[in-house]
From Swiss-Prot:
<keyword id="KW-0699">rRNA-binding</keyword>
<dbReference type="InterPro" id="IPR005484">
    <property type="entry name" value="Ribosomal_uL18_bac/euk"/>
</dbReference>
<dbReference type="GO" id="GO:0008097">
    <property type="term" value="F:5S rRNA binding"/>
</dbReference>
<keyword id="KW-0694">RNA-binding</keyword>
<comment type="subunit">
    <text>Part of the 50S ribosomal subunit; part of the 5S rRNA/L5/L18/L25 subcomplex. Contacts the 5S and 23S rRNAs.</text>
</comment>
<dbReference type="Pfam" id="PF00861">
    <property type="entry name" value="Ribosomal_L18p"/>
</dbReference>
<keyword id="KW-0687">Ribonucleoprotein</keyword>
<dbReference type="InterPro" id="IPR004389">
    <property type="entry name" value="Ribosomal_uL18_bac-type"/>
</dbReference>
<comment type="function">
    <text>This is one of the proteins that bind and probably mediate the attachment of the 5S RNA into the large ribosomal subunit, where it forms part of the central protuberance.</text>
</comment>
<comment type="similarity">
    <text>Belongs to the universal ribosomal protein uL18 family.</text>
</comment>
<keyword id="KW-0689">Ribosomal protein</keyword>
<dbReference type="GO" id="GO:0003735">
    <property type="term" value="F:structural constituent of ribosome"/>
</dbReference>
<protein>
    <recommendedName>
        <fullName>Large ribosomal subunit protein uL18</fullName>
    </recommendedName>
</protein>
<dbReference type="GO" id="GO:0022625">
    <property type="term" value="C:cytosolic large ribosomal subunit"/>
</dbReference>
<dbReference type="GO" id="GO:0006412">
    <property type="term" value="P:translation"/>
</dbReference>
Amino acid sequence: MAKISRKLQTQKRHKRLRRYLIGSTARPRLAVFRSNNHIYAQVIDDDAQQTICSASTVDKELKEDKEKLSSNCSSSSIVGKLLAKRAMKKGVKEVIFDRGGNLYHGRVKALADAARDAGLNF
């Protein structure tokens, strides 16, 4: 029997999780996408099907820190702080965390912890 690839496992896990993780206007969804080189996070209102705010390691605001930003935990925590700051500015205090099928470990955990420390509740 062939071994299931890691990417396919992540996709299956994400499909399972999305049945239960539905963001609303009162409590939007914080969705995380992790690639090999970058990490992306969005605060999404699923009722209105609209992205409230987003942040990533390729963000224009973080362009001066481009040399420091890569696919590591410290970059993820910088993105988490930036996302929380933008969400608070838009009036979002509570979110539902959608890890995107990734394990809650490493870069995903660093982003979540930084967003929590910056004031988001989940």
